[in-house]
């Protein structure tokens, strides 16, 4: 029983260590190098990520035919591999679980592929919520 408690705590705390809830300014700093990528301004991307995942790297949304993972809500139907959809095209050549940690380097690489192939409207929140009045999504600290 003595060993159960420490192992239990590790099991609870370890995933929390890997997760990251970003702020608008933290995310703006990390994504500043892709400002203008695919014709998308940084405030549009920051707005879209807020309405898509709430800046949470562990966000998971289950739909009827697929699941979306992480900060960019990347679908296992086309972009990443999961046991739920073994026939995924896995265009980004990555396990979907990799989008749930605090290292967003691979998330950004896959998001750029999505932008290249589908454009910003892949993320439904963009068209509905992030095409005007974008000044609120600017970070003053950049």
Swiss-Prot record:
The keyword Metal-binding belongs to this UniProt entry's keyword annotation: yes
PROSITE patterns: GLYCOSYL_HYDROL_F22_1 (PS00128), GLYCOSYL_HYDROL_F22_2 (PS51348)
Disulfide bonds: 25-139, 47-130, 80-96, 92-110
Residues annotated for Zn(2+) binding in this entry: 68, 135
MF GO annotations: calcium ion binding; lactose synthase activity; lysozyme activity
Localization, UniProt: Secreted
Tissue specificity comment: Mammary gland specific. Secreted in milk.
Gene3D superfamilies for the chain: 1.10.530.10
Top-rank lineage group of the source organism: Eukaryota
GO cellular component: extracellular space; Golgi lumen; Golgi membrane; protein-containing complex
Glycosylation sites: 64, 90
Database matches in CDD domains: LYZ_LA (cd16898)
UniProt signal peptide: 1-19
Keyword line: Calcium, Disulfide bond, Glycoprotein, Lactose biosynthesis, Metal-binding, Milk protein, Secreted, Signal, Zinc
Any GO BP annotation: signal transduction
Subunit structure: Lactose synthase (LS) is a heterodimer of a catalytic component, beta1,4-galactosyltransferase (beta4Gal-T1) and a regulatory component, alpha-lactalbumin (LA).
Full protein name: Alpha-lactalbumin
Organism annotation: Homo sapiens (Human)
Lineage summary: Eukaryota, Metazoa, Chordata, Craniata, Vertebrata
Gene: LALBA
């Amino acid at each position: 029983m003595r060993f159960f408690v420490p192992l239990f705590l590790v099991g609870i705390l370890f995933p929390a260590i890997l997760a990251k809830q970003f702020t608008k300014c933290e995310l703006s700093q990390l994504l500043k190098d892709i400002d203008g990528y695919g014709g998308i301004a940084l405030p549009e991307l920051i707005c879209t990520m807020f309405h898509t995942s709430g800046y949470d790297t562990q966000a998971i949304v289950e739909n009827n035919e697929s699941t979306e993972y992480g900060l960019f809500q990347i679908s296992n139907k086309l972009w990443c591999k999961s046991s739920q959809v073994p026939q995924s095209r896995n265009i980004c050549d990555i396990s979907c679980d990799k989008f749930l940690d605090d290292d967003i380097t691979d998330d950004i690489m896959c998001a750029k592929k999505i932008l290249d192939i589908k454009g910003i409207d892949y993320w439904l929140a963009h068209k509905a919520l992030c095409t005007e009045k974008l000044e609120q999504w600017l970070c003053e600290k950049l």
